[in-house]
């Protein structure tokens, strides 16, 4: 059981401050309107198949339990926005979860599948890069092996990689430029 002195009394305000530039203060400040009815959890497709409970994440944030930033649960949200649409208090749950994820990532906590998506973008310019199987399938149905919009030009890739380096996104995800993968 947690003790009162272990709670971060300013955590809600940290979340609101972090979310003020994007998605916006109003959206993230809606966190304070949550009265824990559970509509978000009952609506959540991830919650039906995993131990993920949206309401629990929101409750931890409201109580100042900043260890939520270390939790794998925050990465189980699919950002489908069902909770967002169904909340009777108009709490922008998905935007709050994304803001909490951003805080966790800044702290160095990010789910490996999310890091791998970023790796694919830095390697190929696309979160789901074309591979040999995709090329064969496209060819078998009479399409060009490479979709013209699915891959970036070398100039575009250079700009993307420069941007990632300048913003230290590569460091955030632990990207190794030599292996073009995650650092071991």
From Swiss-Prot:
The residues listed in the UniProt record as binding [4Fe-4S] cluster 2, with positions renumbered to this chain, are 44, 77, 80, 83
Enzyme Commission identifier(s): 1.8.98.5, 1.8.98.6
All copies of the 4Fe-4S ferredoxin-type domain together span 24-54, 65-97
Q: Return the similarity comment.
A: Belongs to the HdrC family.
Query: What is the name of the protein in this document?
Result: H(2)/formate:CoB-CoM heterodisulfide,ferredoxin reductase subunit C2
Keyword set, alphabetical order: 4Fe-4S, Iron, Iron-sulfur, Metal-binding, Methanogenesis, Oxidoreductase
Give the top-rank taxon of the lineage listed in the UniProt record for this protein: Archaea
Cite the binding residues for [4Fe-4S] cluster 1.
34, 37, 40, 87
Q: Tell me how this protein assembles.
A: The heterodisulfide reductase is composed of three subunits; HdrA, HdrB and HdrC. B1 and B2 subunits are interchangeable, as are the C1 and C2 subunits. The heterodisulfide reductase forms a supercomplex with formylmethanofuran dehydrogenase (Fwd), F(420)-non-reducing hydrogenase (Vhu) and formate dehydrogenase (Fdh).
What sort of enzyme, by top EC class, is this?
Answer: oxidoreductase
Q: Which gene encodes it?
A: hdrC2
Tell me a GO biological process for this protein.
methanogenesis
Give GO MF terms, alphabetically. 4 iron, 4 sulfur cluster binding; CoB--CoM heterodisulfide reductase activity; metal ion binding
- What is the protein's known function? Part of a complex that catalyzes the reversible reduction of CoM-S-S-CoB to the thiol-coenzymes H-S-CoM (coenzyme M) and H-S-CoB (coenzyme B).
